[in-house]
Structure formats: structure tokens, C-alpha cells
From Swiss-Prot:
Effect of residue 1235 to N: Only relatively minor changes in the thioesterase activity. 10-fold reduction in the kcat/Km for ketoester
This protein's name: Pikromycin polyketide synthase component PikAIV
Cited InterPro entries: AB_hydrolase_fold (IPR029058), Ac_transferase_dom_sf (IPR001227), ACP-like_sf (IPR036736), Acyl_transferase_dom (IPR014043), Acyl_Trfase/lysoPLipase (IPR016035), Ketoacyl_synth_AS (IPR018201), Ketoacyl_synth_C (IPR014031), Ketoacyl_synth_N (IPR014030)
Coiled-coil blocks: 3-32
CDD domains tied to this protein: PKS
Species the sequence originates in: Streptomyces venezuelae
Biological classification of the source: Bacteria, Bacillati, Actinomycetota, Actinomycetes, Kitasatosporales
Length: 1346
């Protein structure tokens, strides 16, 4: 074959192979498009107290009618609205419906929403939020685990009649009414609150909304728009408007009950509720081990088009719809057993729907197998936008229970239908629906919108699950933990109660599998508890008894230290149970046995198991090696379960164990030290000394023994816990003296005197036997209680271990150093019994391991649970069986116990303002404080307490809480609902009450009430202002003084008063803004200046407005907002923008020098030149950002400064930023628009005066305007994003050219809605989206400085 022929053959082979691959890919795509979608989770709430799909099924199966009268909380005055005679204007002849029991209830704090925003929110949004959280939990998915993933949100939401006219909205709800009552926000709020990044779509096709949403979600899953879809619908009737409107049409059933497909049908009947599904591709659900409740085989939507009328149903369209859905499912009509009908109970709609079903599903059916037809609306009314998904949940439950429930209120089938035209039967009685070999059970669900949009889906029973392998028993021989957590203590109590009821009721539950589900499918929150038991009954009992639970609260997890005590922890049989129940413990003990055996003539295991031939723990040369082995083996157990030390600390002989765990000694060397040293003690010191523990400080102890020369201080264990050692007779003498003086003293049961001069007699012997040790460099930080410092070199030689035995143990000072200077918050005593835990200071968390006579798996699991309850990250997988979160055999666990408060704006009558309640009251600040130089002074503790009380009152008032007690003192205010609006309102209130000039960002700089109170108290102390408890008159005046934001501007308080401010206002009104800037620049020369960064009189610490440390760990860039030059500027400029970066990136804002308060509380110094100011900022930024790459962002004049700062960082500090974001800058040479709009600019400054424009700030603005007016020396090499406003600030003549922001250097452009000011206020999310997209691009392509 010629070469050319060979090439041709090769080419043909390659082409055939490529074609085959293309065909395979085409088949894969086709299979993907046709793949059924799995329903893996469901949640719902309906009338009659229905809170779950199980409740719904129980009600439906029992044939319950859930219609009731209008709840009083709605405030409708139904007696005035009701008129039994139809057609009278403004009245309704119906007073019944299937109302939600708690439509006003909502756990706002759980979602970080303030009470005043919750009050402004449509209850439909609130219901969707809680149901969406629950659907993840019910699917066995931790809701926190989906944050940042491509979960799509598709929800149906119709009526939006909750909010009143925004002009008469309740006080304090301004800024929340629009978003709180926009149907578009309903889906977006779910995505925002849960961090979901797939599509977020709200559908309003009236009654078909949620089923249309389901159809769109199925398409999104098949197209790859999302990997998981949350689908739902909601309906809450906030006003009687729907009753009045449909009463005028006489379209409603007078008794409020749906009589679907019945001769007695007399109109629709309203219901309320929320229904949510969670869907995945079937293959994904199986791969992830998620339980499949049912599958959606097919769906279709269409429109009636130009039919009999806008709101009239259209039979041919419904028939076409059903055929479309069956085709999508690749099924025939006879493959479907039942249809959940739309069935609204109207005399027009029901016959049309029934005829469409007869013409489609009613044809071609086998004898005796009619299509069954029912409607959930007969139980729960017409739940409008929620009704479609509600019907899906009903049919999924019917599939699971094998029963088709009956439809209520059907006297007989409607005579408006020829039922003989096909094989369709109404479910007037319940019918069994068992599984059948060779035939899958299927159901159709219909929903038709009043505007003509129709939807139909086909459901199929879940595919058979392969037999699961038997669940392996947990490592602890049946002992399992059930962890529970909540956002608040009250919610935790409720959660515990729910789980206890679950353990009581669900006798089929496997405790180990339920434990795994609790771990895998529930978010770990701050308030925690754990029940430990070896059976369902034991766990139930533990949950019922407070003393049976481990409880804790997570604050700052801080750092973890392992503590290894000296003697005194031993007890006969310690560790014996764990030898049999903990493989990790047994393996570590076996290693120790091997290491000890060359130096001892007894067996470690025999001693632990108390074998008759084994020596007892009474001998020092036995107890010390055994205690060592137990401690290091327990350390291995802690590490196996995910708790690893960031430092180790040992007490006396405990330092040997600590050294081994730290890697500073090998196991062989550690065994040598502990055995040979204890043998020397037994041979030479035993019987010659004693030790005593005193409840005294070190200094008081020293004074006590100064005349007892045979005694010395052996150890300092705590502030009032000191150990003395020495001669036995003097020990007795000291004990008697202490007893006589009422001082607690305990003689330690040892007969030798460690840490005293007695030890000097064995110095030479220890030098000999411990010669040749090979100390290592510690791999885990080792803090020496002998040296009082870190051991960082291989220094633990024989001499060290002599000194360790001879000299004082500085345990308490060591703990203080680790806690105060090194950030250690958790100290785990790794021992068979705790002896040091109770000596730890209150500011740290002390945890034990085993306890005397309680050393088995139950105690170990309890100790591990205590660690988790107090905030440590436990590896639950090491404690629990390896199984999926929820297998088909596992009953559903209780969902989160939301803590509801009532939020409801009642409808107003003619000419009235709406009433509103947040738990039925106006939140006010009830009490005040007297401030100022004339007040009766409190001591420091009293002042801090008084200030904290004031902070709590004002925070409660701003958030519209019932009382200050609802505001957690140690939780960040952002997490309980503070945002940019409430932060400013709160700051204004506190400033007015105290006379201070706190910045609007103060709640972000000092995020918790405690931290904030400390800042305020310190500032008052600096000013020498006293604080006193308020008089009755002062208590009455505080709320008036703390008027809400907007009632009085910052300028009106006097804080912004001054000659220049008044002149500036006049200049703006006269359209002489630019001229006055020159005046301010000239006058600024008379303000004191600083000429080097070191001389800057302000703290320029950047304020963390959003994000967290996770981003830095990932190497993603930190965003730094460069505050602008405006006199009202500061880090608060970025409050609204930064909200969109929460959970995305760290967002810092750095102040500009010259605008704040100097260190002596006077006016800050101005920089002598721009580079000096930039250097001061650069130092602050580099300190705050650490090793993380930095992206600078500025708006307007701040944008110009951001570029100058980038150049300065690059050239003067060798730290070029990863990028620069310039938001609407107008640099020199391109300032014509600024000159034309100078008046609008000035007016904008006064309109946005969150920070009062004092004379000092105006002069600073003038100084920086002069700095930026001239040419600058260079340009930064960092990539630049230019974000431009899309709307002019004022009138603009086209012949002037382009008014938009300009930048001469290379850059990327993003245009966003709004003008120069509103882009950073009303359209801040659009700016954030542009910035985030650009950052992702530059980090993906260029690495963004990683």
C-alpha cells in the first residue's frame, strides 16, 4: 500500500472513530434530556396546623375538612365585611376559608432579618424561607452545604396585597417595603438567604404558578442550568380583597368549601399554604445516596389563547396539554392511574376539566381500570399559587402509602358531564393503590391559571432500591451521639423536645443511622446539645432530662491545647473498658506496652485489667508509666476523632506525655524517661516526703511557709491553687495551721516530695540513666511549664527531665500565657480523671476525657460530644456507621424548630393609616442614662454595665424587638438583622444620646453589643464624661432624644455646625460649588499637618464590612474600599455595596487621614502631601490584608485615590495590588460633567449626610481636592475595571460629547444602572455583580496575585 493510501486509511479510521464518539455524545445528551427527575425532598404548611407532608397525608387520609373562620390576627373586621346577600359592593358573603394558623409567625433572627424588615415583608416571602430551609433538611441535605452551589430556585407567587401604600407604611419599615413585597424578590430572597447560585425565578400564572415553576425547573435540570432545583408555591391572603372581588362576581362557595366535580359545586373556596419540592436528576440522586420519593416522568405547559374568554377554561387546550405531557413522559394515557385535578368546584371549570380528562386519560383503558380523579382542594381549599405543588405532594404521599384518598363534599358527580364518554371515576371513597409487579404506579397533576396558562405533570413511583448492606455498628459498641443545635437557647430547647418526641414515637428507628442523619443533614449552629445512649430508649430518656444532655455554646472557637496532668488521675481499672471498645486506644496501648517492656518487669495490659499477678497502682514506678501510657493513648483517640492540638502543655510528669505527643521525644525515649525516673523516685525518695494542695495564691502560700524551711512551692495550678512539697512532718504542721485558719488544704496521697530539694539526691543518677536521649524538634508547639516559654529546639534532654522533677511547675502562668497572649480558648485534659480542669480560668473552656470509675465508651463519647458542643470540629464519621444520610428505611427527622414572633400590618379602613404589630406592640427604648460632666459618676464596671444596657435598648428599638433581652449580647449585630440602614439609624441614636461622634461603621468595627459598649464606654472615659443611672424624667426623655433616623438629620444635632458648612450650603445653592472648593483648599493650609506616616494622628485600621477569613485561606483577593474625598465620606460609603460581598470575599474599607478624630480626641492632623496620606493608608492595608492579594475600589474622588494608592503600593512598598476598581471617576482633563453638575453634586452631599460635614471635614475635602487637581507622577500596572453610571446626574447637551466616566489608561468597562449617586445606593447589587464577575475573570486568567 502506498504512503498516500495509508494516510487515507488512517484518516478514514480517525473520522469513523470521531463519528462514533459524536454519536455516543449525542446519545448521552438525549438520555440526559429524557432522564426522569427525582423528588428527593418535600415540605409544606397548610391550614389545620399542617406543618409537614406527613401531617398533610394524615389529614387527607382521615378525610379532614380544614376550613375555618378568618383568624382574628388578620384584623379584617369580618363582621363589618360580611353580608350574606351576594353582590353588595365592598362586602363578602363568605367568611370561611382554609386559613394558615400562623401566617404572621416568622423566625426573623434565624435568617438575619431585623424585626422591622420582617414586618415589611410579605408573609408569603417568610413562609417560603422557612419551608425552603425545611425541604433541604427533609431531603437529608445540610442547608449550609449548598451555599455557593448551582441550586436553582423556581417558585410560584401570586397576590401581593400585604403592603400598604408606601406613603403610609409603618414607621421604621422604609427601605424594606418594596423588596419585601415584590414577587420577583420571593425567589431571590431564598437564593440570597441560602446562598444558592443557580437560576432564581418567580412565576405568576395565578393558580398554575407552582406547577409552571416545576416545569421550568425540570427544563433547567435537563439543560444544565442547575444541578438541584428548589420548586414551590405560596399563597397567603393578607387582606380580604380576594373575598370582596370574587364575591362581587358571585364566584365563591358560600360555605368556603370546594365541591370538586360534584353536582353541588357552587364556586371556589380559598385556602392558604406553602409547598416546596427539591429535585435532582435521578442519576445524581442515586449517586449521592439521596432518598427518592418519586420521579417526575414528564410535564407540559400551554395557553388557552383566544378562547371563550380571558378567564374561561378551554377544554381543547387542556386535552392538548395532557397529550403533550404524556409524550414528554413517553407514556400512553392508560399508563397513568390517577389524576389530581385542578377541581376548583366551579360549575363552569369542573365540567370542562372532566371532559378533557375523559377525552384523554379516559380512553383506551382496560376494563376495571378507570382513571381515578380527586382534588386536594376539598380538604385545604384553593391554595392558588401553591396548589399545583400541593397536589404533587399529596400524590407522592399516596404513592408512598399505597392509598388514593377520597375527595370530600361530593354528593354525586356533576350532571354537567357525560361520564360514560370515557373511563373516569371520582374518588368518593378511598381506594387501595398497591404496588403491582410489572406495572409502575403513576399519577397526573393538573393546574390551570385564571389567565389561561395551564400545566400538567406526570409522576411515577420511585424506582426500587437495591437491598442496602447491614449498617455496621458504631465503633463504641452501640453507644451513639445524637447532636442537636439551634440559633438560640430557646430554639435548642424546642429542638430537643421535638427529637425526644421523635425517639418516643418512632420505635422503628435505628439510633446509629439516625445519628448519622443528624450529623449529615443538619447545620451545626451556635447553641448545641448532644444526647448519648446505646438504645432508642436511652437516647429518649437523655433528651427528656436536662442532666442527661451535654450542652454548650459556640463563641470564638479559638485554639486547642492538650493538657497532660501529673499524678492523681489514676484509678484501678482505668482504660480497661476502652481496650475492648476502642480499637485506636487499644492499638496505642499496645505500642506503649512494647516501648515500656525493656524497662519494667510487669505487663501494662495486666495492670490495667487488674490481673491478680500484676502490681497495683500504689507503686510510683508503676503508676507513672501506666498513667503515661493511658494519657498518650487517649491523645491518639482524640486525634482519631478529629480533635488535634495546636499546642501541648504538661504538668510535672505530664510533660513526658506532652513531649511525646508533640514529637519532641520518641515513644522509646519517653518510655525510658517515665520508667527510669519513677524507679529512681521509688528507690530513693519514696517514704521520705509528702505533698499538700492549698486553696491559696502563690504569694500567700510563700508567706505561709517562709518559716517552714523544709517545704517549698511545688506547683502553681491556679490563682488560688498551690501545691507544697517537702518534709512529712512539716506538711502535717502546715495542714493543721491551715485548718485552724479556715483555709482548705488537702494532703496528696504520695510519700515523696517532687519539686523540692529532696529531688537533688537523685540528680546524678538521673543524669546517668537518662544519658543518650535523642530529643527532637517539637512538631506540635510545646509550652514548657518548667521554663515558662515555648520549646522550639530539640532541648528535652536528660537535664531537662531532672529540672522538670526538681523545680516548681508553673501551670497557671502557662495557661494564662496561652489564653491571653496566644489565643487558646479550649484546654482538653487528656487523662483518666480530670484534676486540672477545675483550676482553669473562667475565660477558657476546660474539657475532660475520662472520669474515675467511668472510663468506657459512653464516657468517651460524652467527652467528644462536649468538645463539639463547645465549638470544636469533631470528625463524626469516626464515631458513626458508614451509611447514607437518609436511607429509605429511616423515618424523617424533625426539622428546625423555628421560633416565631408575629409580624403583621393590618389593613386600613378608608382614610386610616394601617395598624401594624410586631408581637402586638411598638418597640421602644424604655429607659435612659444621664450623660455628661455633671452626672454622678459610676465606677468603671458600673459605667460599662450602664452603657451595655443602653446599647441593648437602642439595638432592640432599631430592630423593633419586644425587649432588649431579645438581642444576644455576644452575637454579631449583622447576624440578627443589622444592615446599612439599621446601622446608621443605630449610630444616630447613640450619638444623640451620648454626644459622641461615632462613625456609621461602628457596628462593623465592634460587631457585638458587648464590644460596642466597650468602645462607647472607653470614649466616654477618655472625655472624662460621667455616667449615672437615669432619673424618672431622664428615662422618659431618652426615646425622644433617640428619635429614629430621618426624624432629625445629623447636621441638626449640632455635630456638623460651623461657619464653613453654612457657607458651603450657600455656595451650593448659588451654583458656586467649584469656587468654594478653592476657598476650602486655601483655608486648609491653616490646619495642623503631619509630614510622615508615623506622625499620622488617627488610627486608620480598615473596617471589615463583609466576608470572612475563608476567602483569605483560599488565596482570593481581599477587596479594599478607598474612601472618597467628600466631607461626608468615610468607610460607611460602602455599607450597601459590601452587603453583596458577604460570604463572597473580605471587604475592607480604609479611612482617609484628616477626616477623623486624633488620638487626643481632638481634630485629626491633615497630611502635608498626598504621598504621606497614601503611605499611611498603605501601611494599614498591608497589616490588615496580611498575605492576601488586594484589590482596591473607590467611587468618584475615592476612585482617583484608589489608583494613586495602587501606584504607591507598587512603587514605594513593593506590594502591587491584584486589581483596581474605579467606580464613576472623573479625572483631571475629563471633569466637564462635574463642572456642569456641580450643584447636583453639592446637593447630593447634603442629601446623603450620614457623617455630619463639620468644618474640619470640609477643610479636609478642600485639601484633597487640591492634591488631585494636578498631574500625578505615574500609573499602576494592575488591571483596571471601570464601572460607569448609565444615567446622567443632571441635564446634558449632546453636543458636549460623552458625559460618562472616563479613564485614559487600559481598562475593562462595566455599565450599571443609576446615576453618580444612586449607583452606589439603589443599584449597589449591580455594581457588586460587575465587580465579582471581573474578579473571577482576572483570578481565573491572571491569578489575581495568588
Amino acid at each position: 500500500m502506498t504512503s498516500s493510501n495509508e494516510q487515507l486509511v488512517d484518516a478514514l479510521r480517525a473520522s469513523l472513530k470521531e463519528n462514533e464518539e459524536l454519536r455516543k455524545e449525542s446519545r448521552r445528551r438525549a438520555d440526559r434530556r429524557q432522564e426522569p427527575m427525582a423528588i428527593v425532598g418535600m415540605s409544606c404548611r397548610f391550614a389545620g396546623g399542617i406543618r409537614s407532608p406527613e401531617d398533610l397525608w394524615d389529614a387527607v387520609a382521615a378525610g379532614k375538612d380544614l376550613v375555618s373562620e378568618v383568624p382574628e390576627e388578620r384584623g379584617w373586621d369580618i363582621d363589618s365585611l360580611y353580608d350574606p346577600v351576594p353582590g353588595r359592593k365592598g362586602t363578602t358573603y363568605v367568611r370561611n376559608a382554609a386559613f394558615l394558623d400562623d401566617a404572621a409567625g416568622f423566625d426573623a433572627a434565624f435568617f438575619g432579618i431585623s424585626p422591622r424588615e420582617a414586618l415589611a415583608m410579605d408573609p408569603q416571602q417568610r413562609q417560603l424561607l422557612e419551608a425552603s430551609w425545611e425541604v433541604f433538611e427533609r431531603a437529608g441535605i445540610d442547608p449550609a452545604s449548598v451555599r455557593g452551589t448551582d441550586v436553582g430556585v423556581y417558585v410560584g407567587c401570586g397576590y401581593q396585597d400585604y403592603a400598604p401604600d408606601i406613603r403610609v407604611a409603618p414607621e421604621g419599615t422604609g427601605g424594606y417595603v418594596v423588596t419585601g413585597n415584590s414577587s420577583a424578590v420571593a425567589s431571590g430572597r431564598i437564593a440570597y438567604s441560602l446562598g444558592l447560585e443557580g437560576p432564581a425565578v418567580t412565576v405568576d400564572t395565578a393558580c398554575s404558578s407552582s406547577l409552571v415553576a416545576l416545569h421550568l425547573a425540570l427544563k433547567g435540570l435537563r439543560n444544565g442550568d442547575c444541578s438541584t432545583a428548589l420548586v414551590g408555591g405560596v399563597a397567603v391572603l393578607a387582606t380580604p380583597g380576594a373575598f370582596i372581588e370574587f364575591s362581587s362576581q358571585q364566584a365563591m362557595a358560600a360555605d368556603g368549601r370546594t365541591k370538586g366535580f360534584a353536582s353541588a359545586a357552587d364556586g371556589l373556596a380559598w385556602g392558604e399554604g406553602v409547598a416546596v419540592l427539591l429535585l435532582e436528576r435521578l442519576s445524581d440522586a442515586r449517586r449521592k445516596g439521596h432518598r427518592v420519593l418519586a420521579v417526575v416522568r414528564g410535564s407540559a405547559i400551554n395557553q388557552d389563547g383566544a378562547s371563550n374568554g380571558l378567564t374561561a377554561p378551554h377544554g381543547p387546550s387542556q386535552q392538548h396539554l395532557i397529550r403533550q405531557a404524556l409524550a414528554d413522559a413517553r407514556l400512553t394515557s392508560s399508563d397513568v392511574d390517577v389524576v389530581e385535578g385542578h377541581g376548583t368546584g366551579t360549575r363552569l371549570g369542573d365540567p370542562i376539566e372532566a371532559q378533557a380528562l375523559l377525552a384523554t386519560y379516559g380512553q383506551g383503558r382496560a376494563p376495571g381500570q378507570p382513571l381515578r380523579l380527586g382534588t386536594l382542594k376539598s380538604n385545604i381549599g384553593h391554595t392558588q399559587a401553591a396548589s399545583g405543588v400541593a397536589g404533587v405532594i399529596k400524590m407522592v404521599q399516596a404513592l408512598r402509602h399505597g392509598v388514593l384518598p377520597k375527595t370530600l363534599h361530593v354528593d354525586e358527580p356533576t350532571d354537567q358531564v357525560d361520564w360514560s364518554a370515557g373511563s373516569v371515576e371520582l374518588l368518593t371513597e378511598a381506594v387501595d393503590w398497591p404496588e403491582r409487579p410489572g406495572r409502575l404506579r403513576r399519577a397526573g397533576v393538573s393546574a390551570f391559571g385564571v389567565g389561561g396558562t395551564n400545566a400538567h405533570v406526570v409522576l411515577e413511583e420511585a424506582p426500587a432500591v437495591e437491598e442496602s448492606p447491614a449498617v455496621e455498628p458504631p465503633a463504641g459498641g452501640g453507644v451513639v451521639p445524637w447532636p442537636v443545635s439551634a440559633k438560640t437557647s430557646a430554639a435548642l430547647d424546642a429542638q430537643i423536645g421535638q427529637l425526644a418526641a421523635y425517639a418516643e414515637d418512632r420505635t422503628d428507628v435505628d439510633p446509629a443511622v439516625a445519628a448519622r442523619a443528624l450529623v449529615d443533614s443538619r447545620t451545626a449552629m451556635e447553641h448545641r446539645a448532644v444526647a448519648v445512649g446505646d438504645s432508642r430508649e436511652a437516647l429518649r430518656d437523655a433528651l427528656r432530662m436536662p442532666e442527661g444532655l451535654v450542652r454548650g455554646t459556640v463563641t470564638d472557637p479559638g485554639r486547642v491545647a492538650f493538657v497532660f496532668p501529673g499524678q492523681g488521675t489514676q484509678w484501678a481499672g482505668m482504660g480497661a473498658e476502652l481496650l475492648d471498645s476502642s480499637p485506636e486506644f487499644a492499638a496505642a496501648m499496645a505500642e506503649c506496652e512494647t516501648a515500656l517492656s525493656p524497662y519494667v518487669d510487669w505487663s501494662l495490659e495486666a495492670v490495667v485489667r487488674q490481673a491478680p499477678s500484676a502490681p497495683t497502682l500504689d507503686r510510683v514506678d508503676v503508676v507513672q508509666p501506666v498513667t503515661f501510657a493511658v494519657m498518650v493513648s487517649l491523645a491518639k483517640v482524640w486525634q482519631h476523632h478529629g480533635i488535634t492540638p495546636e499546642a501541648v502543655i504538661g504538668h510535672s510528669q505530664g510533660e513526658i506525655a506532652a513531649a511525646y505527643v508533640a514529637g519532641a521525644l520518641t515513644l522509646d525515649d519517653a518510655a525510658r524517661v517515665v520508667t527510669l525516673r519513677s524507679k529512681s523516685i521509688a528507690a530513693h525518695l519514696a517514704g521520705k516526703g509528702g505533698m499538700i494542695s492549698l486553696a491559696l495564691s502563690e504569694e500567700a502560700t510563700r508567706q505561709r511557709i517562709e518559716n517552714l524551711h523544709g517545704l517549698s512551692i511545688a506547683a502553681v495550678n491556679g490563682p488560688t491553687a498551690t501545691v507544697v512539697s517537702g518534709d512529712p512532718t512539716q506538711i502535717q504542721e502546715l495542714a493543721q495551721a491551715c485548718e485552724a485558719d479556715g483555709i482548705r488544704a488537702r494532703i496528696i496521697p504520695v510519700d515523696y516530695a517532687s519539686h523540692s530539694a529532696h529531688v537533688e539526691t537523685i540528680e546524678n543518677e538521673l543524669a546517668d540513666v537518662l544519658a543518650g536521649l535523642s530529643p527532637q524538634t517539637p512538631q506540635v508547639p510545646f509550652f514548657s511549664t518548667l521554663e515558662g516559654t515555648w520549646i522550639t529546639e530539640p532541648a528535652l534532654d536528660g537535664g531537662y527531665w531532672y529540672r522538670n522533677l526538681r523545680h516548681r511547675v508553673g501551670f497557671a502562668p502557662a495557661v494564662e500565657t496561652l489564653a491571653t497572649d496566644e489565643g487558646f480558648t479550649h484546654f482538653i485534659e487528656v487523662s483518666a480523671h480530670p484534676v486540672l480542669t477545675m483550676t482553669l480560668p473562667d475565660k477558657v473552656t476546660g474539657l475532660a476525657t475520662l472520669r474515675r470509675e467511668d472510663g468506657g465508651q459512653h464516657r468517651l463519647t460524652t467527652s467528644l460530644a462536649e468538645a463539639w458542643a463547645n465549638g470544636l470540629a469533631l470528625d463524626w464519621a469516626s464515631l458513626l456507621p458508614a451509611t447514607g444520610a437518609l436511607s429509605p428505611a429511616v423515618p424523617d427527622l424533625p426539622t428546625y424548630a423555628f421560633q416565631h414572633r408575629s409580624y403583621w400590618i393590618s389593613p386600613a379602613g378608608p382614610g386610616e393609616a394601617p395598624a401594624h404589630t410586631a408581637s402586638g406592640r411598638e418597640a421602644v427604648a424604655e429607659t435612659g442614662l444621664a450623660w455628661g460632666p455633671g452626672a454622678e459618676d459610676l465606677d468603671e464596671e458600673g459605667r460599662r454595665s450602664a452603657v451595655l444596657a443602653m446599647v441593648m435598648r437602642q439595638a432592640a428599638s432599631v430592630l423593633r424587638c419586644d425587649s432588649p433581652e431579645e438581642v444576644p449580647v455576644d452575637r454579631p449585630l449583622r447576624e440578627i438583622g443589622f444592615d446599612s440602614l439599621t446601622a446608621v439609624d443605630f449610630r444616630n441614636r447613640v450619638n444623640r444620646l451620648t454626644g459622641l461622634q461615632l462613625p456609621p461603621t461602628v457596628v462593623f468595627q465592634h460587631p457585638t453589643p458587648v464590644a460596642l459598649a466597650e468602645r462607647i464606654s472607653d470614649e466616654l472615659a477618655e472625655r472624662n464624661w460621667a455616667v449615672a443611672e437615669p432619673s424618672d424624667h431622664e428615662q422618659a426623655e431618652e426615646e425622644k432624644a433617640a428619635a429614629p433616623a430621618g426624624a432629625r438629620s445629623g447636621a441638626d444635632t449640632g455635630a456638623g455646625a460651623g461657619m464653613f458648612r453654612a457657607l458651603f450650603r450657600q455656595a451650593v445653592e448659588d451654583d458656586r460649588y467649584g469656587e468654594f472648593l478653592d476657598v476650602l483648599a486655601e483655608a486648609s493650609a491653616f490646619r495642623p499637618q503631619f509630614a510622615s506616616p508615623e506622625a499620622c494622628s488617627e488610627r486608620l485600621d480598615p473596617v471589615l464590612l463583609a466576608g470572612g477569613p475563608t476567602d483569605r485561606a483560599e488565596g482570593r483577593a481581599v477587596l479594599v474600599g478607598c474612601t472618597g474625598t467628600a466631607a461626608n465620606g468615610g468607610p460607611h460609603e460602602f455599607l450597601r455595596l459590601s452587603t453583596s460581598f458577604q460570604e463572597e470575599r473580605d471587604f475592607l474599607a480604609v479611612p482617609l487621614p484628616g477626616y477623623g478624630t486624633g488620638t487626643g480626641t481632638g481634630t485629626a492632623l491633615l497630611p502635608a502631601d498626598l504621598d504621606t496620606a497614601l503611605d499611611a493608608q498603605a501601611r494599614a492595608i498591608l497589616r490588615a490584608a496580611g498575605d492576601a492579594p488586594v484589590v482596591l475600589l473607590g467611587h468618584s474622588g475615592g476612585a482617583l485615590l484608589a489608583h494613586e494608592l495602587a501606584f504607591r503600593l507598587e512603587r514605594a512598598h513593593g506590594a502591587p495590588p491584584a486589581g483596581i476598581v474605579l467606580v464613576d471617576p472623573y479625572p483631571p482633563g475629563h471633569q466637564e460633567p462635574i463642572e456642569v453638575w456641580s450643584r447636583q453634586l453639592g446637593e447630593g452631599l447634603f442629601a446623603g449626610e450620614l457623617e455630619p460635614m463639620s468644618d474640619a471635614r470640609l477643610l479636609a475635602m478642600g485639601r484633597y481636592a487640591r492634591f488631585l487637581a494636578g498631574p500625578r507622577p505615574g500609573r499602576s500596572s494592575a488591571p483596571v475595571l471601570l464601572v460607569r453610571a448609565s444615567e446622567p446626574l443632571g441635564d446634558w447637551q449632546e453636543e458636549r460629547g460623552d458625559w460618562r466616566a472616563h479613564w485614559d489608561l487600559p481598562h475593562t468597562v462595566a455599565d450599571v444602572p443609576g446615576d453618580h449617586f444612586t449607583m452606589m445606593r439603589d443599584h449597589a447589587p449591580a455594581v457588586a455583580e460587575a465587580v465579582l464577575s471581573w474578579l473571577d475573570a482576572i483570578e481565573g486568567i491572571e491569578g489575581a496575585g495568588k
